[in-house]
């Protein structure tokens, strides 16, 4: 069981690093930072997968994983002398809820084509809200480390 979890984690991390690297290339990230974008995307997606595996819902798992991405990205930006967004934006993209958003949009199309049904409406609302909460948690999670770590005056 442990080996299958480790294999699934490794597979998840490798498959998450590929789109993180691709979006980093689309965003013209400097060549020296590309491997860090891929590594950060793999770490974020892998940590979210582990949290989901151990019973956490996808929304708070996405929040915690994006907070982790933001904190590591800020530390790496100081080390590599680049803006944190260079690392964090491309790294968080593999965690966007494509399946939930796609299912919600398919339900909208089926409602307009076939007419209203309670099952389609329920599917649409459920998947739309799930996708919205995941995107919200990703954006909040990316912004919180900057608010915490760049604060100049005391909190009290």
From Swiss-Prot:
It is found in: Cell inner membrane. Signal peptide: none annotated. It is a multi-pass membrane protein. The chain crosses the membrane at residues 7-27, 54-74, 86-106, 128-148. Its main location: membrane. Keywords: Cell inner membrane, Cell membrane, Membrane, Transmembrane, Transmembrane helix, Transport. GO terms for biological process: succinate transport. GO terms for cellular component: plasma membrane. The transporter is composed of YjjB and YjjP. Belongs to the ThrE exporter (TC 2.A.79) family. Involved in succinate export with YjjP. Both proteins are required for export. This is Probable succinate transporter subunit YjjB. It comes from Yersinia enterocolitica serotype O:8 / biotype 1B (strain NCTC 13174 / 8081). The gene is yjjB.
């Amino acid at each position: 069981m442990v080996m299958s979890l480790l294999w699934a984690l490794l597979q998840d991390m490798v498959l998450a690093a590929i789109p993180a690297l691709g979006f980093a290339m689309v965003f013209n990230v400097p060549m020296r930072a590309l491997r860090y974008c891929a590594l950060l995307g793999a770490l974020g997606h892998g940590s979210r997968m582990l949290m989901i595996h151990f019973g956490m819902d996808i929304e708070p798992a996405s929040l915690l994983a994006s907070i982790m991405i933001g904190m590591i990205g800020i530390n790496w930006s100081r080390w590599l002398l680049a803006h944190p967004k260079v690392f964090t934006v491309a790294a968080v993209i593999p965690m966007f809820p494509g399946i939930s958003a796609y299912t919600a949009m398919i339900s909208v199309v089926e409602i307009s084509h076939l007419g209203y049904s309670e099952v389609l409406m329920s599917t649409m609302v459920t998947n739309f809200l799930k996708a919205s909460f995941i995107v919200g948690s990703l954006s909040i999670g990316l912004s919180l480390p900057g608010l915490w770590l760049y604060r100049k005056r005391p909190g009290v």
